[in-house]
Design a protein with these regions (language model features):
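C-terminal accessory regions
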Residues: 399-432, 438-444, 449-526
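P-loop NTPase Walker
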Residues: 1-87, 278, 481
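Conserved P-loop NTPase-based nucleic-acid remodeling module centered on helicase motor cores
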Residues: 51-130, 335-336, 341-346
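ATP-hydrolysis module of ASCE/P-loop NTPase motor domains
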Residues: 86-177, 366-386
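Conserved helicase NTPase motor core
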Residues: 2-12, 17-19, 165-250, 439
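Conserved helicase motor core of SF1/SF2 NTP-dependent helicases
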Residues: 21-26, 30, 34, 38, ...
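Conserved helicase NTPase catalytic core signature
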Residues: 133-202, 392, 396-424
């Protein structure tokens, strides 16, 4: 196997613990496995980011003779150690359950009737997730302050916290106790937190070396578990692929003070493209005072531009948001090509009970609403305001989908299912969002037009935070590094000069601003777009 100098330096390192910043497609897994092979006398734990990556690693491990290496996700490790199989588990806490627990607590403990508003329930749910992903132990005002600093909260949610801090902490304790005592289902992050808190179980794991993959997207509680060990540690990740801060992920590569190595050459695409991408993104990272990207590629040519896409061969469409993906779907579905969805069609919020319920809410057919949380709202406008206040992007995407296409959504769903295939090899077009494409690669890629650009970054009237801009640029980078041979890049508008009277910043208006457009103008824009994208007239 031919290795780069960067890879050889890591494999031959005499440092006991260190971190590796590896660009997309730079062979980080191969590097780690080669390092493990050279240190096969050690008992090694390889922490994979998720189950699918664990399966992929187990397949790669067959080529290596490493009987002393164990591959696991950190949740699987915690599940067995903490005996989480004794709990009934759920991937997510339902708002209705939180509301019921709080109402019952107030009635039995404080002897008063109390019915929390939806925004308050959403706040408690978010706080539970924050606590379970943090390394903090105490449930106190320090936790609340930390939550406020790490979350971009709207004015209404901030007001709820500031006016009700004591009650918020009390209800947070109530929900956590209900999970611990098996009154309600426990989340997977909850038993991970329980594992972290139980130092007798979570410290001194029986390994000489722990390899932590995707270190840019792990949580503080995961970092805490690894750092509590007395063995050697190696963290590997890509700082430019940190795209999960909304799940309270932390970039361990920036947080952990260890000797550092870099893998800057990608084996995925040509060096010509690597330099274009590096220069384009760095011009925007620089505006945001972010760390510059350094990346190189292979001695091959990767073609840039839609005119190079061969539509007779398989290609992949990557969008920033679910709604952006729907727009691309509507455009391509008329070509009668076979389509495939990364992660499965059902994992996208196109047509499910939530979409149906919101559609019927708009139609004022409340008797047909099946989702309890949506029953709390009288109109779709109320739900939209709630989604903006709580930054519920899933609801906002669905509302935009319904407002744009009306009852066309049923026809769109029917068309998709007509051409849907379940085997990727059979597809003419692969559809995915950036987050679902992470870790994957394609011969040909088309990026949708819903990514951030210079227009939004330089907009001082509706200024985005440093963290938001950095993550949005990272999301662009992840999508842009999926292609091997040909790519149509989303326009970064690099020549744009900010004008405070410019109203063309559609990305900001659609994703970050709560100001409602004039209904008549909005309707005209929708009609124009539908006509352009070959959809029947909006009803």
């Amino acid at each position: 196997m031919i290795l780069t100098k960067e890879q050889e330096e890591i494999i031959n390192s005499d440092k006991l613990s260190f971190k590796i910043n590896a660009v997309a497609g730079s062979g980080k897994t191969t590097t780690l496995l080669e390092y493990a092979k050279k240190n096969s006398h050690l008992k090694i734990l390889y922490l994979a980011y998720n189950k699918s990556l664990q399966t992929s690693l187990l397949d790669k491990l067959k080529k290596y003779n490493l009987p002393s290496m164990h591959i696991s996700t950190i949740h699987s490790l915690a599940y067995n150690k903490i005996e989480a199989y004794n709990y009934t588990l759920a991937h997510d806490l339902k708002n209705q359950i939180i509301e019921n627990v709080i109402t019952k607590h107030e009635l039995t403990v404080n002897q008063k009737a109390y019915y929390p508003i939806p925004e308050y329930v959403a706040l408690i749910k978010d706080l539970v997730n924050f606590y379970c992903n943090s390394s903090l132990i105490a449930l106190d005002s320090k936790l609340i302050e930390s939550y406020k600093k790490q979350s971009e909260l709207g004015a209404k949610i901030l007001e709820l916290i500031n006016k009700n801090e004591t009650r918020v902490i009390e209800h947070l304790k109530t929900i956590l106790s209900a999970m611990k005592n098996k009154v309600i289902d426990a989340t997977h992050d909850f038993y991970l937190k329980m594992f972290y808190l139980n130092k007798k179980v979570s410290t001194n794991l029986p390994y000489d070396l722990i390899l932590v993959d995707e270190a840019q997207d792990i949580s503080d509680v995961m970092i805490g578990i690894v750092e509590n060990q007395s063995c050697r540690r190696i963290y590997v990740g890509d700082s430019f692929q940190q795209i999960y801060t909304f799940r309270f992920a932390t970039n361990a590569l920036n947080k952990i003070d260890l000797p550092s190595y870099d893998l800057t050459q990608s084996f995925r695409f040509g060096d010509n493209y690597a330099k274009v991408l590096q220069n384009n993104l760095n011009s925007l990272y620089e505006i945001n005072s972010s760390k510059p990207l350094k990346i190189s590629g292979l001695e091959k040519t990767t073609l840039i531009g839609k005119n190079h896409i061969d539509f007779n061969k398989q290609f992949c469409v990557i969008a920033r948001s679910t709604f952006g993906l729907i727009q691309q779907l509507v455009y391509f579905i008329h070509d009668k090509k076979k389509v495939y969805f990364e992660g499965g069609y059902n994992s996208y919020s196109f047509m499910n009970q939530t979409v149906y319920s919101i559609f019927y809410l708009k139609q004022k057919k409340n008797d047909k609403i099946t989702i309890d949380e949506i029953k709390d709202f009288d109109t779709i406008n109320e739900l939209e305001q709630f989604a903006k206040d709580t930054k519920n992007q899933d609801y906002l995407n669905i509302i935009k989908f319904i407002n744009t296409y009306g009852d066309n959504i049923f026809e769109i769903n029917k068309k998709i299912k007509e051409f849907l295939v379940t085997d990727k090899k059979d597809a003419d077009i692969i559809f995915t969002t950036t987050h679902k494409s992470k870790g994957l690669e394609y011969d040909q890629v088309i990026m949708a037009d819903d990514f951030i650009s210079k227009k939004e970054i330089t907009n001082t009237k509706n200024k985005l935070s440093y963290l938001r801009v950095n993550e949005e640029l990272n999301i662009y980078y992840v999508a842009a590094t999926r292609a091997k041979d040909v790519i149509q890049l989303a326009d970064l508008n690099l020549s744009y000069t900010y004008n405070e009277n410019d109203e063309t910043t559609s990305y900001v208006k659609s994703r970050f601003i709560s100001k409602r457009a004039d209904n008549k103008k909005s309707k005209e824009l929708q009609e124009e777009w539908l006509k352009k994208n070959r959809v029947k007239k909006l009803i």
